[in-house]
């Protein structure tokens, strides 16, 4: 989608979100929650309702629209309604506004991809015994597969973060449109499907930038402290989906792997998650950070 069409779509979605808020204000004592995307609520809503009660969900289509909504409505409505704003940090500087919850890492998708979250997915979704050899093998498999995926996507994450920093600090603008999955022209990730077809020179040529190795090194030092949290969340969740699909299908005998060589020797009770449903299905197993808990406690009604 070109920039003009995206801007038009974003404007239309903002009008819809604004209208939804205006309708919501007819409900006395309501709590309005403004999210970036349609599926963000899949992660947030259970936590919000547990602490704050019922809510009115208002997807705004993008981060810019959540920020715009705040500018337009907050000052005149903050004393009448409970208004909560949820945004992904992405590769931007922290907003540092207490009226917002901002993810500690790149996005909510990253909260599903930590080792702790994967452990809960194994025990609470796939019903793998925490003390079993299957559990140990699956955790080792997770570590190895994410290590391999990060070896492919690391340089691109450093590069894209450097681009965002250049845009902010140098008042430059680049048109880099990213899909949800890792760009096929740059390589591939997923179990048994790792390939890297790029370097910094190719990235600069492909996207019309002039990022230097020093720029990359600066981002590397920040992002590589915890790749599962700090790398682009869409690629992290792509890798998690690949791992889960592989484990489930292999255990079901669909991978032509002898049982003695499978990661999970006991077949899980659950089937593969349908496309687009992972954030909803696994929401209870994703990390629930203290930062989010503290933010929601501000809206608690005793």
Each language-model region and where it sits:
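Acidic, divalent-metal-binding catalytic cores of TOPRIM
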Residues: 1-302
């Amino acid at each position: 989608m070109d920039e003009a069409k995206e801007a038009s779509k974003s404007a239309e979605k903002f009008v819809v979100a604004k209208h939804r808020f205006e309708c919501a204000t007819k409900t006395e004592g309501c709590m309005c929650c403004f999210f970036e995307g349609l599926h963000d609520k899949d992660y947030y809503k259970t936590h919000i309702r547990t602490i704050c009660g019922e809510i009115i969900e208002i997807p705004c289509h993008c981060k810019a629209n959540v920020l715009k909504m705040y500018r337009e409505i907050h000052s005149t409505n903050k004393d009448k309604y409970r208004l909560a704003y949820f945004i992904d940090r992405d590769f931007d500087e922290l907003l540092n506004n207490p009226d917002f919850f901002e993810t500690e890492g790149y996005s909510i998708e990253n909260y599903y991809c930590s080792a702790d979250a994967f452990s809960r997915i194994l025990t609470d979704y796939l019903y793998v015994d925490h003390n079993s050899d299957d559990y140990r093998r699956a955790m080792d498999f997770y570590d190895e597969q994410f290590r391999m995926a990060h070896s492919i996507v690391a340089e691109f994450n450093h590069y894209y973060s450097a681009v965002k920093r250049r845009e902010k600090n140098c008042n430059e603008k680049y048109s880099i449109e990213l899909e949800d999955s890792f760009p096929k022209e740059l390589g591939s990730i997923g179990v048994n499907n790792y390939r890297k077809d790029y370097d910094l020179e190719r990235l600069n040529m492909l996207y019309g930038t002039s990022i230097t190795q020093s720029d990359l090194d600066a981002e590397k030092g920040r992002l590589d402290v915890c790749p599962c949290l700090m790398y682009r969340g869409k690629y992290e969740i792509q890798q998690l989906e690949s791992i889960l699909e592989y484990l489930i299908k292999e255990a079901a005998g669909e991978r032509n792997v002898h049982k003695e060589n499978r990661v999970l020797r006991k077949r899980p009770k659950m089937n593969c998650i349908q496309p687009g449903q992972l954030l909803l299905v696994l929401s209870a197993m994703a990390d629930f950070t203290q930062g989010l808990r503290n933010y929601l406690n501000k809206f608690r009604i005793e």
